[in-house]
Amino acid sequence: MIVFVRFNSSYGFPVEVDSDTSILQLKEVVAKRQGVPADQLRVIFAGKELPNHLTVQNCDLEQQSIVHIVQRPRRRSHETNASGGDEPQSTSEGSIWESRSLTRVDLSSHTLPVDSVGLAVILDTDSKRDSEAARGPVKPTYNSFFIYCKGPCHKVQPGKLRVQCGTCKQATLTLAQGPSCWDDVLIPNRMSGECQSPDCPGTRAEFFFKCGAHPTSDKDTSVALNLITSNRRSIPCIACTDVRSPVLVFQCNHRHVICLDCFHLYCVTRLNDRQFVHDAQLGYSLPCVAGCPNSLIKELHHFRILGEEQYTRYQQYGAEECVLQMGGVLCPRPGCGAGLLPEQGQRKVTCEGGNGLGCGFVFCRDCKEAYHEGDCDSLLEPSGATSQAYRVDKRAAEQARWEEASKETIKKTTKPCPRCNVPIEKNGGCMHMKCPQPQCKLEWCWNCGCEWNRACMGDHWFDV
């Protein structure tokens, strides 16, 4: 297999190794190539200095993995031992390294708190798990992290957790201790260590993720989907009841589990109905599929599961909702829909075309029709004829209007919502109306125009 070595954080070169090649042997190969003493080399991978006795396989190095090798003078014995460096180590010390390696970190237990209801069985707190841990650290047979790979995979994939120095941005930082929860990984400056690059005093740790499905370069990073985890305990999906893996775990009190296919369908359905929730802090998000309170998804990259086309719609709708929440309007011309932020009280709105986005349409902010003088209601009223020599019978003029019948029908079957003024058509049925706008949803009475109440229900629920 091939591993790529970056020497002193500069250039990189490939080295051919076997799975049973030791770290000491890797140092000797690099030392011979670079013309430096092997005992001055330190091998850094995934936030830890690799001890000499471990093999490539023990260190979880995979095909085309990138390791950093730095040349630094040997430090005092107690410092070297503490970092797992050049001094010989016992098997138990090697096991300690394995348990602290980023390649063995498992944060899935922190997706669910110990006091969660209904799905606490997914936690690794039972006696079986404890007994397995007592036998010593082993590489997980499941994926601990998941990411969305924007390319070349374009889908959810297993992820690899890595760390770099916050100062020089090189993956040469050795952690003082490994992360124990998602906050350690996601919140900046929570973890520290020591950068092994020459002349770099950096101590801040910056974590990042890479796609585990294909070889990656230093710059190929992905965002972690911290709600997605392997379904090791065979929890059925809340929607289809099938047992699938991986699954998404909502952050509600019950930690409801949903498979990724059902989550995709849930998102598309809500998107089609424009039923996403606009949160001032989080943005355009969705709660638990069961409607649990305080369960909005905080990491919006989870909606990448929608796929490119639907995700583009999601971004567009989110931007539109943001404009509306800010008191703006959307251009009503079909095919445009540009977001506009006119001055407060400004009734005449122009969809500016200078920025390449607007269409130039001038419309009324209140009724969303082409701009007009006077009240919006006057658009549906017959306009008075101006003084002229040729006179016609008023009654005949009213009966001869081609579009008047349609306007009269609109008057009779359409009324504005009392709260948001969106026109709503009544096509038979009772007087109980509900505004379809996601940000309004007012339930009101068609007959009296007020919010729906028991008096309306008793007096004219089914008035014709």
Curated annotation (Swiss-Prot):
Written domain comment of the UniProt record: The ubiquitin-like domain binds the PSMD4 subunit of 26S proteasomes.
Region (REP): 377-409
Record key words, sorted: Autophagy, Cell projection, Cytoplasm, Endoplasmic reticulum, Isopeptide bond, Membrane, Metal-binding, Mitochondrion, Mitochondrion outer membrane, Nucleus, Phosphoprotein, Repeat, S-nitrosylation, Synapse, Transcription, Transcription regulation, Transferase, Ubl conjugation, Ubl conjugation pathway, Zinc, Zinc-finger
SMART domains reported in the protein's UniProt record: IBR (SM00647), UBQ (SM00213)
Annotated stretches, region: Disordered: 70-96
Residues given in the record as Zn(2+) 4 binding sites: 364, 367, 372, 376
Protein name: E3 ubiquitin-protein ligase parkin
Pfam families found in the cross-reference section: IBR_2, ubiquitin, zf-RING_12, zf-RING_14
